[in-house]
């Protein structure tokens, strides 16, 4: 089982605040996510600028595309994104369109599982050639006190068994990682637990150490 990668979510409102994070921890993570908030706040230039600064890192545009899959994904890939996200409620043809464009750029598409989705949809994504999904405990759910539970673990295992590369996100803290031990997680996303730590560098390194201990 390969080691899960570590992704930092830049859900900053401005590039200036995003740079405060990347200056510290870009070299400590595998993937730099231009979060949805930053995508809205700064547009695709955020993707272009971060990829220019860190060409050796995977840069994800968390655009959560809901429609116009080809147009919006092309905007992201032309800004040098490596991966883009499509929201789970999007029509299957939106996901297919985004994937078609991704292939032109040797990129990839992730289906963002935020909100309601079905196993029938999951099979449609697999049949369409989608390889990646993001299992997401929403920001608002976290704020309401919703914790990771057995239903989450069961769903993540099932997605993995279907052949998906599964990314896990949603207010992850270091203490959550053992919950997922034994599952071939593709990526763990940490946002505020790294960005807002007293020492973001040490927080990122602790995540990497824990991943190596649990999956090594």
From Swiss-Prot:
GO MF annotation terms: 3-dehydro-L-gulonate-6-phosphate decarboxylase activity; magnesium ion binding; orotidine-5'-phosphate decarboxylase activity
EC number: 4.1.1.85
Family matches, as SUPFAM superfamilies: Ribulose-phoshate binding barrel
CDD domains noted in UniProt: KGPDC_HPS
SMART domains: OMPdecase
Transmembrane feature ranges: none
Cofactor binding mode and count: Binds 1 Mg(2+) ion per subunit.
Residues at which substrate binds: 11, 192
Gene3D superfamilies recorded: Aldolase class I (3.20.20.70)
Alphabetical UniProt keywords: Carbohydrate metabolism, Decarboxylase, Lyase, Magnesium, Metal-binding
Domain of life of the organism encoding this protein: Bacteria
Catalytic activity: 3-dehydro-L-gulonate 6-phosphate + H(+) = L-xylulose 5-phosphate + CO2
Function: Catalyzes the decarboxylation of 3-keto-L-gulonate-6-P into L-xylulose-5-P. Is involved in the anaerobic L-ascorbate utilization.
Family: Belongs to the HPS/KGPDC family. KGPDC subfamily.
Assembly description: Homodimer.
Protein name: 3-keto-L-gulonate-6-phosphate decarboxylase UlaD
Organism: Shigella boydii serotype 18 (strain CDC 3083-94 / BS512)
Lineage: Bacteria, Pseudomonadati, Pseudomonadota, Gammaproteobacteria, Enterobacterales
Gene behind this protein: ulaD
């Amino acid at each position: 089982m390969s080691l899960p990668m570590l992704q930092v979510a830049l859900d900053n409102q401005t590039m200036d605040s995003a740079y405060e994070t990347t200056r510290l921890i870009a070299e400590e993570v595998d993937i730099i996510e231009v979060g949805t908030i930053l995508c809205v706040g700064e547009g695709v230039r955020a993707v272009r600028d971060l990829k220019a600064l860190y060409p050796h890192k995977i840069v994800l545009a968390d655009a959560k595309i809901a429609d116009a899959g080809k147009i919006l994904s092309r905007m992201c890939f032309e800004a040098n994104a490596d991966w883009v996200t499509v929201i789970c409620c999007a029509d299957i043809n939106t996901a297919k369109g985004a994937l078609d464009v991704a292939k032109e750029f040797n990129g990839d598409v992730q289906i963002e599982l935020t909100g309601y989705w079905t196993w029938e949809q999951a099979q449609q994504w697999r049949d369409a050639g989608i390889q990646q999904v993001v299992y997401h405990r929403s920001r608002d759910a976290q704020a309401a006190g919703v914790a990771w539970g057995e239903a989450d673990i069961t769903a993540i295992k099932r997605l993995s068994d279907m052949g998906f590369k599964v990314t896990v996100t949603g207010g992850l803290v270091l203490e959550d990682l053992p919950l997922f031990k034994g599952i071939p997680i593709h990526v763990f996303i940490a946002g505020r637990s790294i960005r807002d730590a007293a020492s973001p560098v040490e927080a990122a390194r602790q995540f990497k150490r824990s991943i190596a201990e649990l999956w090594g």
